[in-house]
Amino acid sequence: MNIKKYYILIAEGVTDCSLLEAVLEQYLQFSSFAKVDELPEIFKNMIGIYPSGLGELKRTDSPMFYYKDVIGIAVKQANGCNNLAAKASALIEIIDQLDVYDQFGGFLLFGETEDEIKTLLTRTFKERDFDYTGDVIKAYGHELTCKLHLLPSSGRGAIEKVLLKCVEKSYDTLTKDAENFKMVVMQPEYADIRKKCWAKKDEIQEFYADKVQFEAISAVLKPDRPVRFAIKDKIIRKEYYDLYMQIPDFKKVYDFLVENLKCVEE
């Protein structure tokens, strides 16, 4: 397999990553690598391991790996907005060790819409002696492309806001019933549960309410399975492509990937 360009997509959580993976698979015709032996060296170095040297049994996370023609892609979970720059910084070390700067196409970072995210990225990279300005990271005498996409693209919220727009078009009745359920659990009778299980602040409870609605939909579409399976198996499907392209935030994600993953259309 002759991979000439590598890209690394880093998103905040499993839901974000699942959406990106599904778009790559369903709408951009990328295939996932099936075996470790098939992976390019840079991707092999990103595979999670059990940190036995520390006496721990918790395995570090592994990305999903994809290819199409001469393009190789890793999709990695950051586990929170605060970790986007930290994950990218750790991967820069791998790029530097293998000296694959010429083959590296860049980082694509995906975060929730927050006013402070760009400042946070700049500060975290600087703590690691990397200079992040605009769409570029300066590291070890090299300039690496690093572009940020926010989901949703305006206002406050999480990736679930975009996904709820999708299921409104593909599963309308289910979405309405799930919204009714959300309204029920936002009533005063559930205030104690929300404070104990979600958050104490009302604005954060509103943030989690979208997640509850989407997870209710997911539980119907893929019972007894994590949310990622509903996204990849039931929501992001080829037959819904035209419907989803009518959703501005979804189309922006699609366009951002096409624009920045060079050779996708070649």
Predicted regions and their residues:
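Activity-critical C-terminal alpha-helical subdomain
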Residues: 105-106, 110-222, 226
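Surface-exposed acidic, glycine-flexible loop patches that form ligand/cofactor-binding
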Residues: 1, 94-102, 137
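Charge-dense, extended regions
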Residues: 233-266
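Domain-level signal for Mg2+-assisted phosphodiester chemistry and nucleotide/NA-binding surfaces
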Residues: 1-93, 124-127
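Conserved aromatic-histidine-acidic binding/catalytic patches
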Residues: 7-15, 113, 151, 155, ...
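Acidic beta-strand-to-loop metal/phosphate-binding motif
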Residues: 8-12, 76-77, 102-116
